UniProtKB/Swiss-Prot annotation:
InterPro entries in the record: PyrdxlP-dep_Trfase, PyrdxlP-dep_Trfase_major, PyrdxlP-dep_Trfase_small, Ser_HO-MeTrfase, Ser_HO-MeTrfase-like, Ser_HO-MeTrfase_PLP_BS, SHMT-like_dom
Swiss-Prot/TrEMBL site (Plays an important role in substrate specificity) positions: H229
Biological process per Gene Ontology, one example term: glycine biosynthetic process from serine
Listed SUPFAM superfamilies: PLP-dependent transferases
Metabolic or biological pathway: One-carbon metabolism; tetrahydrofolate interconversion; Amino-acid biosynthesis; glycine biosynthesis; glycine from L-serine: step 1/1
Subunit structure: Homodimer.
Origin species: Streptococcus agalactiae serotype V (strain ATCC BAA-611 / 2603 V/R)
Protein name stated in the entry: Serine hydroxymethyltransferase
Highest taxon listed in the record's lineage: Bacteria
Gene Ontology cellular component terms for the protein in this record: cytosol
A Pfam family per the record: SHMT
Cofactor(s) essential for the protein: pyridoxal 5'-phosphate
Coiled coil: none
Length: 418
């Protein structure tokens, strides 16, 4: 019987090896992808539990299946912890991803074809904020706002002007590659001025909001969406928050049965664990350290005239760098750094001139290295090594030196003890 196959390694050597190789890769790499992090063993244990066996369409106490008493407890814990952590009245923990959380919010607030104002992808927005290749751009009429060409920061007066000209039904605030504080109060004022809903996608900064190191959107947004990984350091999944009961009911209907069937209760359990971790006082220190590390790294790039630091700095967990003075494009920079076991992603920069498959920039984030215990000193050194590798990308001797020093760093800060 299949139930006898309890030795994973013996039963499926190929798959076991692939997972083992990935564990080794993560251990030996400096992870600087801003949307990635390192979850606790408790989060992994919850996600790998028997809850994966249980189907539970509906919501706690209102299920379409029997035998749901235990999963009701699990999901209720996740809901209450999310509400407490973010000081919100209502929470839906069922979205399978941030994109599905955004889709549910759109479904709850607007109709297909309605005008929506969202951040331009090259300026730091997300695919689901109106990109033509996304369901969002195909289903709704998105108009984009960008950043100021000089400061490379949000220009709220210009956003108001665009809103007045286009009269959107919904304004989306939030980003996937914007390094500065977002003023949600100003966004709400703009939304109110044109009688629009305000939705905030805080997927990237949720952990910083939770730890008190970025202003919360909850008092201002009609709906707030997020992922539960990234800076929140939980499993991959989505979460929707609101203080409006009528909107909460629409959100619930949009998630189920609107977009999804049965929730992934094993993932919801892992979300509950991560939310409890974020409620611990130590998480405030973690959020502070993420920002300190990002600012330390950004400063190294800022002090080198061969690189352009977008917006001249960072207030959060990430920053963007134009690398085209030292290497052809961001894609090549990504590949060179991967050679020396530093993982990040190519990224478009404001007013990008290259294709999204090449880009002028790279995006650098510090959640994962901070989770491993690295601090300001290590962050500065990593930035120095990145610059060394990029400036000497055709010199294999130099790349070997960098790779060896990266190995020393990763050995000193293991992914998981034992």
């Amino acid at each position: 019987m299949i139930f006898d196959k309890d030795n994973f390694k013996e039963f499926d050597q190929e798959l076991w090896q692939a997972i083992h190789d990935e564990e080794i890769r993560q251990q030996n790499n400096i992870e600087l992808i801003a949307s990635e992090n390192v979850v606790s063993k408790a989060v992994m244990a919850a996600q790998g539990s028997v809850l994966t066996n249980k189907y539970a369409e509906g919501y706690p106490s209102h299920r379409y299946y029997g035998g749901t008493d235990c999963v009701d407890v699990v999901e209720s814990l996740a809901i209450e912890r999310a509400k407490t952590l973010f000081n919100a009245e209502f929470a839906n923990v069922q979205p399978h991803s941030g994109s599905q959380a955004n889709a549910a919010a759109y479904m709850a607030l607007i109709e297909p074809g309605d005008t929506v104002l969202g951040m331009d992808l090259a300026a730091g927005g997300h695919l689901t904020h109106g990109a033509s290749v996304s369901f969002s751009g195909k289903t709704y009429h998105f108009v984009s706002y960008s950043v100021d060409p000089k400061t490379e920061m949000l220009d709220y007066d210009n956003i108001l002007k665009i809103a007045q000209e286009t009269q959107p039904k919904l304004i989306v605030a939030g980003a996937s590659a914007y390094s500065r504080i977002i003023d949600f109060e100003k966004f709400r004022q703009i939304a109110d001025a044109v009688d629009a809903y305000l939705m905030v996608d805080m997927a990237h900064i949720a952990g910083l909001v939770a730890s008190g190191h970025h202003p919360s959107p909850i008092p201002y947004a009609h709906v707030t969406t997020t992922t539960t990984h990234k800076t929140l350091r939980g499993p991959r999944g989505g979460l929707i928050l609101t203080n409006d009961e009528a909107i909460a009911k629409k959100i619930n209907s949009a998630v189920f049965p609107g977009l999804q069937g049965g929730p992934l209760e094993h993932v919801i359990a892992a979300k509950a664990v991560a939310l409890k971790e974020a409620l611990d006082p130590s998480f405030k220190i973690y959020g502070e350290d993420i920002i300190k590390n990002a600012q330390a790294m950004a400063k190294v790039f800022k002090e080198d005239d061969d690189f352009h630091l977008i917006s001249d700095g960072t207030d959060n967990h990430l920053f963007l760098v134009d690398v085209t003075k030292v290497i052809e494009n961001g894609k090549k920079a990504q590949n060179v750094l991967e050679e020396v076991n530093i993982t990040l992603n190519k990224n478009s920069i404001p007013f990008e001139r290259l294709s999204p498959f090449k880009t002028s920039g790279i995006r650098i984030g510090t959640p994962a290295i901070t989770s491993r215990g690295m601090g300001v000193e290590e962050s500065r050194r990593i930035a120095e090594l990145m610059i060394k590798a990029l400036k000497n990308h055709e010199n294999q001797d130099v790349l070997t030196e960098v790779r060896q020093e990266i190995k020393s760093l990763t050995d000193a800060f293991p992914l998981y003890e034992n």
